[in-house]
Amino acid sequence: MFSRPALTRGQPAGSSPPAQRGFAAVASPKASYEPATIAGVKVASRDDSGPTTRLAVVAKAGTRYEPLPGLTNTQKRSALRITREAELLGGQLTAYHTREALVLQANFLRDDLPYFTELLAEVLSQTRYTTHEYHEEVENVIHMKQAKLDASAIALDAAHAVAFHTGLGEPLYPTPSTPISSYLNEYSVAAFAEAAYTKANIAVIADGASEAGLSKWIEPFFKSVPAESASSISTTASKYHGGEQRIPKTGSNSVVIAFPGAALGANQPETSVLVGLLGGESTIKWSPGFSLLSNATAAAPRNFAYSDAGLLTVQISGKASAVRKVAEESVKALKGVAAGGVSQEVLVKAIAKAKFNLLSASEVSGTGLVHAGAKLIHGGQPLKVAETIKALEGVTAEQLQAAAKTLLEGKASVAAVGDLHVLPFAEDLGLKV
């Protein structure tokens, strides 16, 4: 039942001023990660005093340096015990890899920081790589991931391969035809883990924990992580090559058009704005969208930022005839930018989109954890959010025009997967490879 004051029964209509709608205040962006070194371990944290925490160990152990599996048994806990204890605490454990990093991440209630800090330290220093576990679990997981590879994933890997050859050109997951049994076993995995899991190669990133809280638990639990290893991770500087690769496949089609992009920490805000400008789909339900590719079928521009290189891609997936048409439109749109066809109105929208992409990637998907860790393990500093936003706001139409011209004048990396009778060659698109 409504209270009497809420009903205001009998009150004259004009006795109070009419309600007025106001604009909501602009929310401040989340604080940047603050770096520190605790007991020889590179750490970065930010604390919004919320009820939950995300804690991640980012190791320099991605496919660029050779792949390896994630969470498994440790000397103190079995995989089953780890799972059951995490469930009892309401936590979530995930392990995944990128081209440069292996990420062990835990999401949990704030008060459970001691348990999950100890658990992640155990995984680094006390994991047991058993023969039966490798053959019964790890091999099966690899085969399942190989079976799930679609044209989009294969095309993206192929574009990286022609762009960088080795290193960043290694696929995220090997294709079914890759002879992995000749190279991969429980001993090679254990040897790679020994080289990768050292204090010099890892960073601990926390979102929702204070530096003081981290220091209290990292110091005792991570002291068992070795400072260095007898063997080391092989690192070769990335070199962009460009080229073309075509792979026949039934059932699905995908084309990736790629160019040199912005590396992590590079002062190239125009690249992010160019991604926002190209867009690919409308983000508003009843609007056709402002982006140059908003009417395209499944066209997805993105800048893949790595420690010493970047790859700006436009990926198009769908029916072969539609993919060909949209690939042509994508290059046409980029040429339009190079010719100076960006209005002030569209530029403002593209900058706003770039700012949203930056902030949402950090807050929603957890990309900020990985990027902060990747920067630390490669000797850099975490992203400064306020400074980056200011740089995005300063991008001009002339900068976008110059960036687009530079891309088109250089060598592209083009990958086509699917019906090769229909899918275009780079030459058909007017691109140099």
Per-segment meaning from a language model:
Residues 1-85, 190-291, 413-433:
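His/Glu-rich zincin catalytic helix
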